[in-house]
């Protein structure tokens, strides 16, 4: 699984739980419309699944 994922924060983390904010920070997403490129790993996929309503993922 050496593919990369482009993850964009499309909704703000305001009003979300601290765990949710921690997951976003763990992926490097700090502001709306910020895009990061991360390796496609099971750990990253798990974080994406927990914050799926806040992010957009491109493979």
Swiss-Prot record:
Keyword line: Ribonucleoprotein, Ribosomal protein
One GO term describing the cellular component: cytosolic large ribosomal subunit
Ribonucleoprotein keyword on record: yes
One biological process term in Gene Ontology: translation
An annotated Gene Ontology molecular function: structural constituent of ribosome
InterPro entries xrefs: Ribo_uL30_ferredoxin-like_sf, Ribosomal_uL30_bac-type, Ribosomal_uL30_ferredoxin-like
Pfam families: Ribosomal_L30
HAMAP family: Ribosomal_uL30_B
Family: Belongs to the universal ribosomal protein uL30 family.
Subunit structure as annotated in this protein's UniProt entry: Part of the 50S ribosomal subunit.
Protein name, UniProt field: Large ribosomal subunit protein uL30
Organism per entry: Citrifermentans bemidjiense (strain ATCC BAA-1014 / DSM 16622 / JCM 12645 / Bem)
């Amino acid at each position: 699984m050496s593919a990369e994922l482009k993850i964009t924060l499309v909704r703000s983390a305001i009003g979300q739980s601290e765990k949710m904010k921690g997951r976003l920070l763990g992926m490097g997403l700090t502001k709306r419309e910020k895009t990061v490129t991360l390796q496609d790993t099971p750990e990253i996929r798990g974080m994406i699944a927990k914050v799926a309503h806040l992010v957009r993922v491109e493979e």
